């Protein structure tokens, strides 16, 4: 499909016929299977016939494009853009008859036509090959020519795409009908394909069999098709015969598929084509919107220039695209050649009816195509070919068969078609008027001419042309038009995209056909109506949406049509009949009936869509059944939703649609912009720009266009605005209420109709949006964001308060088929024609809408924007708009299907629930923002679109679901780590508190402006836990995306630990009870404090270890027996305290500032690096006030570590550094030295802290080492548990007693440091230096460990980000220390180390702060940068919040960062750390008296860090040496802590299970679990 699309793009660009191939190729490329049929269909419904395929395969696909293109581009003969001047415009019974005389100008259509029919907007440029006129005469030669051309192109297609032919055959089968709609609309060959295959059922069958068959027998059937083109009857016989044989087998399948492809396919193709077109060429879609039709009319007229050449007789389908114009001429000629078309049609009807009564419709299409292929077929190709693009099915079926046999039906259809044509003409005028005006005019003119020439053909042709060309045009044509003429045709790929949708829709049409197989005429009405209705409803909806915004333009064309009856004779009374009576009664009734929406559904929506809906419902139901999972994302989704209540899709689509409604209400521009951004339609962006302008025009421009452009009824602006808007509001309420009520029905309608509605609501500007949205929305069909885009488009129209519309939406599963757009327009009258013809009636509709809250009152000025679609919708029914907005808002978070239902139930809540903060906020404030709506529209454009897009992206990624908090109660901490672990956290973190998320969203909206942000910082700090835990998500739900990452926990999981999510998570999981339990404890508190924004007292409570423990439930000391919870709780509590302290730190910022380490850790790990200077964490660690909880925890950790570290100084150093240092020793040491610091053990602890810090610094390279250690850690989880458990247990045990044991700890620290330094300075020749280094290393690592301990609990994920360096340092340091400690402890005597330690402690006390600050500051800097990035991404939500309060500390943080950055560099640049650290160590240690010693320590740490990278794995090897040194005091603590090294003192080096022996088992368990947890934390962090 891509190749074909590219091929078609190439061909289309290469030549006009390639553009037609764009249509054909576009159809084929979009869906893989249907793409080819579409291609074949695009090439020609009959192009699928090998002949046609040959000439149209190359011709129809290429000839249609190639002929059109080669005729237009390649063949200069038919390359002229035919200008059609509208001689006559008759609106009879809602049917628009345009007599367009084709001036065979190579350039543009007459400016009169432009001005009259499409003022500037509708530029009908029918680029027909000279052959278009000649097509009748030179049809055979042209057919041959184009056959050759097509053949060559088809060879190109077939040769370049041998599979393309097969795929084309196949895709033609799948998309042939869609392409029949798409290409057949503009392809006589296509039409012939229609004729032979009825392009919908038959051609799809043919597509399957005949496509392959025809592709196989390109020359064979191609000649037949050529003959069809040349001799419509003969070729049609061949084509039909080919189709009959080939299609008969595939008849059922092709019928089903063809119905999908043709009815649903027409829709799907249109939608999909539009989508593909918009997606592929959504930007060109507006101009290309006519292009599918316009490739029929413009591309086909341009491309139809070959079609014009093919115009004669059946004019080979490919030449028929020129015949489109030519057929518009040929439509006149069709009157002349009607014998041929009639005979052809009759033959085709006979053959096709024989082929398939059900197919008969498709055959009608085929017959239409055949007729079009023949002069009548040219006429139909004029009509049908113009609409071949999108609406060929409708046009051809009703026109063709109705033309021949069901003239009555055709007339009915023609009324419908005329209504549609009127709609579509305006739509075309609008869609084309923007970008496809000439093509629209061409198509309209072609349709009109074709209609006039071939009354039956024009009727259905017009209807279909209006429908499909409008859709196809708007979809394809818009895309194509948006794409340059060539690009337009090239943009027929939207037909490809449309093909899936069209296939989907075609099944509806086919189902209609199947439903009415015997009634070929009726089926044509049925099919034409259900497919046409689908197309009309959807396409008309799209067209209406496109046309209705253009409605001003169409009205303006209507003004020319109306005003300049000389040029256009527009009979508006019929329109009025159609639109007003039906619309008003339905409006009033439906408004009342619709429930939420007051706006009545368009009467046509009711009646037409009702009739068609029934058929289409079945079709849709069948379609949903037939095409439930196809790539008809939007159309089919919506069809599915309509049909099958595809829960997710339905809700999603409904959400999307509803959201889009709100967007459209709020901002059509936003809708368009959001569409493109949401849909990620890069191609759509250009049309978006024009659609954006169009959207603005749509808002202002419906009235402005009405008043300005719509010189027609300038005075009627109000009436017109409401009427123009009224249909969109009608659709909008339909969509809106459809969304709430018939979710299943809604998606079908929203998919196409809503999108169409959206453009309709959009206004002329919305014309582009429609085509853009048609393409884009349909393009959105597959992506959720596309869906959202589509629904945004839909919601845009839904913005208009037509609440009654939802009834329509409910009415039919084919709500998409409602004649929603047609009904909208038809509701006014023949809907669009009614609007064009009866702008006065439009006033009435607004009155009805006014009844719907939408209102004439909101007219507030004739030209005022108040009645603009968005304004009117916004103004009209705030409640309804709210509903729509609610629906809308949940549209974006498509992942929140329940939200949609909830939102439907709880509008405000769900508004909040809207991930879209702006949307939710706006939703809440919509009543307030009535006056602000204009600004809000802009706001929506910028902020909302950005937020919406981001949110859509996020929610596409994140599935927001409501989960029980208890799910995370078990393992809240791991839940934290699960923040972005795929299974656990992403769901909890977003899903967790949708209500709170919504509330948070609204609160953030309101409170973000207040002082809330700072609290959010705190919350953010805690949110990770909260999010990770059961409760966090309420505060985290909103912050989860922002807050959690800010906390750096999610970031860590996502970024740093995305690589190692399992280790962190696993380590916690392995220490599952403890990590899970421990998080459970802090999270509630964190959650309460953060979520509740606990005041300082609560923070202090949480801060205090006891309080934290008590509050946490399994606090540090409380759960001491279970060391895992305590350890995890300890770490978590540290961070919890840090979080509280962070807040407290904000109060005590200066105090903490002095001791940057604590704050750094707090800030870093609180995820508020900005808020916390590195020293703050250090101070918090050492800060007495903050030390209470932290020191208590740290005391436990320190005590453990001191016991472990002191008792097993060497061993513990090894253990801590090797494994436990990553988690336990680093944490324990950090806590240890912090406690020592806090308790006056500062001299010993600072040394260790410095040593640790620098070991941590040097450990950056050990990050990998830490990872190794981490890997090691998981394997030796027992060892880690023992080590960590003992150390942490001791720390926890010492939580309250540590200060008592402070001296003990200090002594043990000294011993530990002695052994640690000895092990730490393996490469340091000077014991003193080594001791200093070790002390500094210990201190730095202790600080880091403390930071990690706090930071980890605070935000393990947060730690993961900042700690990645720090913990890596710790890991490296720990591993280095462990490894080095094992060997160095032997080497260096404890006394030397102790002597050095004493010295280093003095220096390190200050150095500790500096180094901690530096490390933390650097981490904070990193976090700050990440936070800023995240904030930037999140719209500075947290930038404001975080920056708000932390700004006090940023300078300090910066200072710390300056200091820390070098340290971090040291840490990171392990190889260069040795050189850096000494130089950096002065930076860190310059203030310290023992600067040299610190430098030496740093150097030793660096040296060890260098050694460390190998050491993390080596730590176990060093284990043997360490055992002898550790025994002095450490044995027990060491065993407790490092009880897993070879010796209990050095168990860390050992597997980690020996610890139990030396350590009390409880301590060992503690050591085990905490160590594992911490090791896990530390390791995960690295």
From Swiss-Prot:
GO terms for cellular component: cytosol; nuclear body; nucleus. Residues 1-76, 124-246, 278-416, 446-513, 595-617, 709-787, 845-880, 1128-1155, 1182-1215, 1236-1265, 1429-1461, 1470-1489, 1507-1582 are annotated as: Disordered. Residues 278-298 have a biased composition (Low complexity). Residues 1137-1150, 1439-1448 have a biased composition (Basic residues). The keyword Lipid biosynthesis does not apply. Signal peptide: none annotated. PANTHER family: HISTONE-LYSINE N-METHYLTRANSFERASE ASH1, SET-BINDING PROTEIN. Interacts with SET. This is SET-binding protein.
């Amino acid at each position: 499909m891509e190749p074909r699309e590219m091929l078609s793009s190439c061909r289309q660009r290469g030549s006009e016929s390639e553009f037609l191939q764009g249509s054909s190729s576009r159809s084929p490329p979009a869906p893989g299977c249907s793409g080819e049929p579409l291609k074949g269909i695009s090439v020609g419904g009959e192009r699928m016939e090998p002949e046609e395929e040959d000439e149209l395969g190359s011709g129809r696909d290429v000839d249609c494009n190639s002929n059109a293109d080669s005729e237009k581009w390649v063949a200069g003969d038919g390359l002229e853009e035919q200008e059609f001047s509208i001689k006559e415009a008759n609106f009879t019974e809602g049917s628009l008859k345009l007599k367009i005389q084709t001036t065979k100008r190579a350039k543009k259509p007459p400016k009169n036509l432009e001005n009259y029919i499409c003022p500037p907007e509708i530029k009908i440029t029918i680029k027909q090959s000279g052959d278009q006129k000649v097509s009748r005469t030179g049809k055979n030669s042209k057919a041959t020519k184009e056959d050759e051309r097509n053949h060559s192109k088809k060879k190109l297609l077939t040769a370049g795409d041998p599979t393309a032919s097969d795929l084309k055959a196949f895709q033609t089968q799948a998309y042939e009908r869609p392409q029949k709609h798409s290409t057949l609309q503009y392809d006589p060959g296509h039409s012939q394909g229609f004729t032979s295959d009825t392009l919908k059922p038959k051609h799809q069958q043919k597509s399957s069999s005949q496509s392959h068959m025809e592709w196989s027998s390109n020359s064979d059937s191609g000649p037949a098709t050529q003959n069809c083109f040349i001799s419509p009857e003969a070729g049609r016989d061949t084509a039909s015969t080919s189709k009959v044989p080939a299609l008969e087998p595939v008849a059922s399948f092709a019928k089903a598929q063809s119905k999908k492809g043709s009815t649903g396919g027409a829709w799907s193709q249109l939608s999909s084509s539009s989508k593909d077109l918009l997606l592929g060429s959504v930007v060109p879609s507006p101009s290309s919107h006519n292009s599918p039709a316009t490739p029929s009319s413009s591309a086909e007229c341009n491309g139809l220039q070959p079609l014009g050449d093919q115009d004669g007789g059946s004019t080979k389908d490919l030449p028929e695209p020129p015949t489109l114009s030519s057929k518009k001429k040929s439509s006149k000629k069709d009157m002349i050649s009607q014998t041929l078309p009639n005979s052809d049609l009759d033959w085709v009807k006979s053959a096709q009816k024989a082929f398939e009564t059900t197919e008969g419709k498709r055959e009608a299409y085929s017959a239409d195509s055949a007729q079009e292929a023949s002069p009548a077929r040219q006429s139909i190709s004029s009509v049908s070919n113009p609409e071949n693009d999108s609406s060929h099915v409708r046009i051809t079926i009703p026109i063709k068969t109705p033309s021949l046999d069901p003239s009555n039906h055709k007339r009915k259809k023609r009324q419908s078609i005329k209504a549609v044509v009127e709609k579509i003409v305006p739509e075309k005028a609008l869609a084309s008027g923007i970008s496809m005006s000439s093509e629209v005019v061409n198509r309209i003119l072609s349709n009109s001419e074709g209609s006039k020439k071939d009354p039956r053909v024009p009727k259905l042709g017009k209807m279909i042309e209006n429908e499909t060309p409008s859709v196809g045009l708007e979809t394809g044509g818009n895309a194509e038009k948006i794409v340059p003429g060539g690009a337009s045709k090239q943009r027929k790929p939207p037909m490809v995209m449309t093909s899936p949708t069209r296939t989907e829709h075609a099944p509806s049409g086919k189902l209609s056909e199947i439903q009415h197989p015997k009634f070929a005429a009726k089926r044509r009405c049925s099919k034409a109506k259900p497919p046409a209705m689908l197309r009309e409803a959807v396409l008309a909806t799209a067209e209406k949406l496109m046309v209705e915004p253009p409605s001003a333009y169409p009205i303006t064309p209507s003004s020319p049509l109306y005003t300049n009856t000389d040029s256009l004779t527009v009979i508006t009374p019929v329109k009025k009949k159609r639109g007003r009576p039906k619309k008003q009664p339905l409006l009033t009734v439906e408004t009342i009936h619709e429930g939420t929406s007051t706006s009545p559904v368009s009467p046509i929506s009711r009646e037409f869509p009702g009739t068609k809906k029934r058929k289409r419902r079945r079709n849709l139901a069948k379609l949903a059944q037939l095409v439930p999972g196809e790539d008809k994302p939007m159309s089919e989704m919506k069809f599915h939703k309509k049909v099958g209540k595809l829960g997710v899709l339905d809700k999603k689509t409904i959400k999307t649609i509803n959201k889009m409604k709100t967007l459209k209400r709020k901002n059509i521009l936003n809708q368009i912009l959001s569409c493109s951004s949401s849909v990620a339609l890069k191609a759509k962006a250009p049309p978006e720009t024009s659609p954006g302008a169009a959207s603005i025009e749509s808002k202002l421009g419906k009235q402005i266009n009405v008043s300005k452009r719509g010189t027609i009824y300038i005075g009627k602006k109000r009436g017109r605005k409401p009427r123009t808007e009224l249909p969109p509001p009608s659709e909008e309420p339909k969509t809106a209420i459809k969304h709430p009520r018939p979710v299943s029905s809604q998606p079908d309608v929203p998919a196409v109709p809503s999108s169409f509605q959206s453009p309709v609501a959009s206004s002329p500007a919305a014309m582009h949006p429609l085509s853009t949205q048609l393409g884009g929305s349909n393009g959105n069909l597959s992506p959720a964001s596309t869906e959202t885009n589509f629904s945004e488009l839909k919601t845009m129209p839904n913005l208009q308060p037509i609440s009654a519309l939802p009834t329509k939406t409910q009415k039919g599963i084919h709500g998409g088929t409602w004649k929603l757009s047609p009904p909208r327009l038809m509701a006014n009258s023949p809907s669009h024609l009614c609007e064009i013809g009866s702008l006065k009636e439009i006033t009435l509709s607004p009155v009805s809408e006014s009844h719907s809250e939408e209102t004439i009152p909101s007219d507030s000025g004739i030209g005022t924007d108040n009645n603009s679609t968005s304004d009117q919708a916004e103004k009209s029914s705030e409640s309804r708009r709210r509903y729509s907005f609610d629906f809308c808002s949940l549209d974006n978070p498509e992942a929140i299907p329940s939200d949609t239902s909830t939102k439907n139930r709880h509008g405000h809540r769900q508004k909040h629930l809207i991930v879209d903060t702006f949307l939710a906020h706006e939703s809440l404030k919509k009543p307030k923002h009535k006056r602000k709506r204009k600004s809000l529209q802009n706001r929506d454009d910028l902020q909302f679109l950005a937020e919406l897009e981001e949110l859509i992206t996020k929610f596409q990624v994140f599935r927001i679901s409501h989960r029980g908090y208890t799910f995370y109660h078990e393992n809240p901490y791991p839940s934290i780590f699960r923040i972005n672990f795929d299974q656990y956290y992403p769901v909890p973190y977003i899903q967790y508190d949708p209500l709170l998320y919504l509330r948070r969203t609204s609160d953030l909206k309101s409170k973000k402006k207040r002082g809330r942000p700072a609290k959010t910082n705190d919350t953010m700090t805690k949110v990770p836990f909260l999010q990770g835990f059961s409760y966090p998500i309420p505060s985290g739900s909103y912050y989860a995306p922002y807050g959690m990452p800010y906390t750096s926990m999610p970031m860590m999981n996502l970024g740093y630990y995305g690589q190692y999510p399992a280790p962190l998570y696993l380590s916690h999981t392995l220490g599952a009870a403890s990590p899970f339990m421990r998080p459970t404890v802090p999270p509630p508190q964190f959650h309460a404090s953060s979520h509740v924004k606990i005041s300082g007292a609560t923070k202090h409570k949480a801060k205090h270890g006891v309080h934290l423990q008590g509050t946490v439930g399994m606090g540090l000391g409380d759960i001491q027996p279970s060391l895992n919870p305590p350890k995890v709780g300890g770490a978590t509590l540290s961070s919890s305290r840090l979080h509280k302290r962070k807040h407290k730190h904000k109060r005590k910022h200066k105090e903490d500032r002095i001791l940057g380490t604590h704050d750094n850790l707090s800030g870093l790990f609180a995820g508020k690096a900005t808020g916390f200077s590195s020293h703050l964490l250090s101070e918090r660690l050492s800060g007495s006030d903050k030390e209470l909880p932290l020191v208590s925890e740290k005391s436990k950790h320190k005590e453990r570590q001191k016991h472990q570290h002191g008792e097993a100084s060497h061993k513990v150093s090894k253990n801590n550094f090797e494994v436990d240092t990553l988690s336990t020793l680093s944490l324990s040491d950090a806590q240890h030295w912090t406690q020592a610091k806090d308790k006056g053990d500062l001299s010993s602890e600072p040394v260790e802290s410095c040593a640790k810090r620098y070991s941590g610094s040097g450990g950056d390279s050990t990050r990998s080492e830490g990872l190794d250690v981490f890997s090691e850690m998981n394997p030796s989880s027992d060892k880690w548990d023992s080590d960590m458990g003992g150390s942490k247990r001791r720390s926890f045990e010492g939580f309250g007693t540590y200060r008592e044991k402070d001296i003990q700890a200090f002594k043990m620290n000294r011993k530990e440091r002695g052994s640690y330094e000895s092990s730490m300075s393996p490469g340091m020749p000077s014991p003193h230096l080594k001791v200093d280094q070790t002390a500094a290393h210990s201190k730095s690592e202790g600080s880091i460990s403390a930071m990690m301990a706090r930071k980890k609990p605070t935000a393990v994920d947060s730690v993961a980000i900042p700690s990645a360096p720090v913990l890596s340092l710790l890991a490296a340091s720990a591993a280095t220390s462990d490894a080095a400690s094992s060997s160095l402890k032997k080497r260096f005597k404890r006394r030397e180390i102790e002597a050095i330690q004493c010295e280093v402690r003095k220096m390190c006390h200050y150095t500790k702060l500096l180094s901690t600050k530096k490390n933390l500051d650097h981490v904070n800097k990193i976090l700050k940068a990440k936070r800023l990035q995240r904030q930037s991404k999140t719209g500075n939500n947290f930038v404001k919040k975080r920056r708000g309060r932390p700004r006090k500390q940023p300078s300090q943080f910066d200072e710390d960062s300056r200091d820390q950055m070098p340290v971090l560099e040291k840490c990171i640049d392990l190889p260069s750390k040795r050189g850096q650290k000494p130089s950096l160590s002065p930076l860190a240690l310059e203030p310290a008296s023992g600067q040299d010693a610190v430098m030496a320590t740093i150097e030793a740490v660096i040296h060890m860090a260098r050694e460390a990278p190998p050491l993390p794995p080596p730590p176990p090897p060093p284990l043997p040496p360490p055992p002898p040194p550790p025994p002095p005091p450490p044995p027990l603590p060491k065993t407790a802590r490092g009880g897993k090294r070879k010796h209990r003192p050095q168990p860390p080096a050992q597997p980690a299970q020996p610890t139990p022996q030396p350590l009390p088992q409880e301590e060992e368990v503690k050591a085990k679990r905490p160590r594992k947890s911490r090791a896990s934390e530390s390791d995960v962090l690295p």
